[in-house]
Amino acid sequence: EPIFAVADLSPSPQAARHLAAVLPMQPARRADRLAQPVATLYTGGEPSADDVIDAIFALADTVALLPGAGALSSPRWLIRLQGGSDGPVPGAADYTGESDELAGSTGLAALEEIEDVAIVATPAAAAHPASHAQVVQALWAHCRRMRYRVGIVDAEQGMSLNEVRTFAGQFSDSLLALYYPWVVTADPSGVRPELTVPPGGFIAGVYAGTDVRRGVHKAPANEVLIGVTGLETDINRFRQELLNPNGVNCLRFFPGRGYRVWGARTLSDDPEWRYVNVRRYFLFLERSIEKSTQWAVFE
C-alpha cells in the first residue's frame, strides 16, 4: 500500500492544484515540512511537448539516475511501521525445502539445482535454539548428498563453553565446521548503533576470499574479520584449548591485529579429516578428476 499519495495534480500554473502549489520546496506549514516526503522543482510555465520528451529521455538515461553531488546531504526519511508479524519461525522442513519444477524449488533443495556451490551456511537458524540442531542436521544431509560441499555451522547466541562443546558433540562429519562466538557489527540501517549476529556470513566471506587469494589448500584461519567491531564472548588461549579438541573454531581479538578467525577444524573425529583446508582440498581434487574424466564415461 502507498505510504504517501497526492491526487489531481496539474503541471499548469493556472490550475488550482498546481504541482508547485501542492508540493512546494518550502511548505508554509511546519507540519507539512515535517511530513511531506517529496517536493517539486517545477515552478515555470506550462511545459512544451519538447520538454516532456526531454524529461522522458532523461528518466531512461542511466547517468541521469545517478545521485547528484548533494545526494549525501539530503534528508533521510525513516518510516516506522507498527503491528504486523514476521510469521512463524522457519523450521528444519523450511530449510530443507522442496523441489518443484513449475513453481520453483525452495530451501536447500533449490541449491541442489546449482552445480558449483561449494560453501553452504544457515546463520539465521542459530537465532532459534528450538530448531537449530534439526536445521544443522538438514544442512549436514545436504552436504553429504551433494558430495562436494561443506557446511558452516554457527554456535547459538549466549552459549557458554560447556554448552558449545555439548552442541558440537551432536555432530561428527568432516563436511561441517563450527564457529564460536557471535560477532558484533555496525547496523547498516543506522537504526541501532550495533548488532550481534551469527558469525557464519563473515566466515563464508573468509572462505571465499582465501579461495581466491591463495586457493582451497590454504586454511581459512588467521584471517581478519572485516566489519566486525566486537565479540559476544572474549576467547583467550586457555578457553580455546578447552574448545579445540571438540572441533570448535574460535574467533578472537589480538591487540594490533584485529578480530581474526583462529581455527580451521572440522567436526570430524577422524584425525585424517581434522582440518577444513585438507577436506576442501580433497573435495576440490575429487570434483576436478570427476569433471575431467567425463569423456570416458561410455568408453
Model features per residue range: what roles?
Residues E1-E299:
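A glycine- and small-residue-enriched flexible loop/hinge signal that marks low-structured segments
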